């Protein structure tokens, strides 16, 4: 049972559906040999078996919805297939049914028509594949767990899909320093489990953990739920191995916390969304597993109170504050309606989830109790509940983590992932509700408040050009006016590549294009993604 | 007085010279207008007035000691000087005496013969200067506080010195988020004071704080004393403004914690040591000022005990551990001999400095006391002392921070800054003592143990080619064998540029050269630095 903290708090029983798990996806048992699963038993595409993808109406082909022209790449020929088969025998997939899931993104908003999926196991194989594609001028779409939010993870036309799903080996783990070196296709949740057994945790965590790959996380510079405490992958990733467009293997897979020998090349690939190279292995430093974790789930009467609660937490919890997430009442309704999760506290306009992670259960509980007393007594919080044991902690987290899933069940989702000055974070949501009126089914706001990161989502029965027109460029212009970012953590992928200019000046865009030309002169890696098409 | 923690600890009076300050340099009062000092009163080069530089024998000209050829850049003409005078009237320095200090590095190991020092105040001025130099093919040496350790901060021949000393304005500070935006020439210690008054701290700290500039810190990707807790500048620097070789201003000066719009260009400039662009402004996130800081200074009987003490601290102090530094007994002798600092504890083979920073004085003291009891009782530590008030904390820190200064007073210093597996960190010091015998005056080891970072220093009466031959490439090969880094935090600059290959594979070096060619096609920015000369 979730422990009510003080008597006036809600003591209702929390969970309607008792058997659910923290990770919503039907997580596949991916063949992490050293993580204890024998490889033979997995069906090749099990890791993509989301219920939200399977079934439902066919997703519109990307070029039918978006104005995009195929670039003059070659088309995969029988000879190409034979060459691939030589490099990775038995792992060249051309079966249309198996290809279907890899051609469609998690949100079911874009669809490519690739005819071939390649499943290498080693960097050497990736290198040989790219060498071949480079020579043959074949476009390539690197794919991890395919949980990306911006249409970057699937082909736009017939690009070869290069999946890291079978590159799922832990290479080494140092149990004093906590430095993990692994292949790019390791599933984040598997890695989490692996390092937790050794008394460490992964420095990042996100709702997609059951499916996303560490390589995909690095390629998107994923933020997620622990960013507030453990910072960006730019600090925690120590090394990368990357295969360049022409097949050259760039080995920067060092396991050193500090290394200032020359330019830090790995940084170019972090967040480059598969457009500059294919990440094949990652070295990452894991923080020690905290001895005590507490989660409080609180109801706030207004957004001003959410902000004030954050300030109070930051001031009083200091170094043990490990997450501060918020969601509005519409989010709560959606997780209730679509996923049958029950609100553990009184209905409120806003909810926040506060997590502490520390090295002394007693000290942490004392700090958190002081905070909770203060926010309750001052009226910043009207109701709340707290959990310390792992199962209950996960239950509370699910309310926040499964919002993305609930939204995707609500209809077509227009997704915006913005960095904004924290004081103005919620204004845009209110503004849009008025602007869109009944044209939108739901306009919701939630996200990583502690990082100034708003997930603004608008759902509708179906994709609608008119609704899109009401949203864009309005949302981007609004954000730019606040000097915010039009993509805080999801990247630009296919769907946001043309809005780069709202957050970056022309000089920067030109430099990015030069960098792309330097590393991928033929432009075969994830074309139509990240950078606006050149004039 | 420094409080003895438990009765068996040393209670001797600590400090021979009562009047000393934490920062050893004769720190200049640099004209940070908004930081409270009127600009008019400073002599132009006051910030370089180190006693260790002034006086003493003339430093050998770099090309006389090192095999390096001047590249075919133009020579500064009267017309160039007139053009500079037009851009920055009154701030073009050609007086040989004033130029002397800017031509010699802090360690007095390299000397250039530049005839002109430029002191712009704005990015626009930097842009105009570089536009002129680019057109005229004049080589440029960006210079911050000139505290660099690898000869990167001074000209090798007659490069134009472009100093950020007058670019010392705070642009903005947000007192909720702690995000500071400032010009590149702000002195780290001034910034520290500025943000501390607002209840934040800088995420980095180093012994050179009284002189080094934030731009120089970013240009060298400085690590320093808070790296263990607050991580790398790659995570804490949020934005940069950079002037490119041709004078183009690249404005990536965002103040957002998260921004995944396109490639993160600022990363290319962090740690690029002035070879890819001139950093003119920095946006950096400052952590809240901890409410309680404790420092313990401990004596350990051996290096194995140092390591075990570290593990104990990490395990028991967890999130409040903010520094773990070590030094050997020779270091202590040198700070005693050259700086008259007194050892606060019993003489020991090794000393460690443990710092905690947290949000509850009571909780932190309790945690630290538990640790200290444990390490004393188990014999890992034989003597120690602890401090909580700021003055005493600074006194203990000085023992560690002033080692660099003590070494520079001991004679010519051969400096190595290595990342090594922590278990083998001290082996190389022992090995070298045997190898060098009486040829070396002192062979000492100290550094950021918590980050696996050893500062290995060898002193001699004077520079000696023979001693150099005994040290190099031996030290680099030894490090490479351990898969370490031949420059953990100091960068490569002029003196280490040719050893890049010990830590990076040829593919990486080639890519770095391409990056340099892309951003600085004429190679005018800090030539002869960071990258090995191309064949
Ligand atoms: C429920 C849910 C919650 C989420 N929560 C968060 C969150 O909190 N924070 C956040 O930042 N993101 C979040 N995301 C989106 C996030 O981008 C992804 O979940 C994750 O980082 C992508 O990993 P992936 O392996 O699925 O990559 P994919 O989706 O397969 O690919 C993403 C991009 O990276 C490229 N890529 C993938 N692997 C490689 C590789 N090895 N080398 C080069 N390029 C590669 C692809 O080409 C594509 O452009 C969430 C997504 C979902 C579905
Ligand atoms: C006593 C002492 C202690 C030190 N401790 C540490 C430590 O703990 N950790 C650590 O990492 N380092 C340490 N250092 C070395 C460290 O590199 C410097 O102190 C500091 O980061 C350099 O800053 P600076 O402003 O003095 O730069 P400079 O020495 O002036 O320049 C260093 C390099 O950066 C370039 N540069 C400077 N400013 C700019 C700019 N605005 N744009 C582009 N390029 C620029 C220069 O061309 C040069 O290549 C120490 C040095 C001393 C003397």
UniProtKB/Swiss-Prot annotation, chains A, B:
Key words, A-Z: FAD, Flavoprotein, Metal-binding, Mitochondrion, Oxidoreductase, Transit peptide, Zinc
Question: Quick one: a GO biological-process term for this protein?
Answer: lactate metabolic process
Query: Which residues hold (R)-malate?
Result: 400, 404, 415, 490
Q: Which Gene3D superfamilies match?
A: 3.30.465.10, 3.30.70.2190, 3.30.70.2740, Uridine Diphospho-n-acetylenolpyruvylglucosamine Reductase, domain 2, Vanillyl-alcohol Oxidase, Chain A, domain 4
- All copies of the FAD-binding PCMH-type domain together span 110-289
| Activity regulation details | Activated by zinc and cobalt ions.
In the record, which residues are listed under signal peptide? none
Role, per record? Catalyzes the oxidation of D-2-hydroxyglutarate (D-2-HG) to alpha-ketoglutarate. Also catalyzes the oxidation of other D-2-hydroxyacids, such as D-malate (D-MAL) and D-lactate (D-LAC). Exhibits high activities towards D-2-HG and D-MAL but a very weak activity towards D-LAC.
Q: What is the recorded name of this protein?
A: D-2-hydroxyglutarate dehydrogenase, mitochondrial
What is the organism of origin for this protein? Mus musculus (Mouse)
Q: Tell me what gene encodes this.
A: D2hgdh
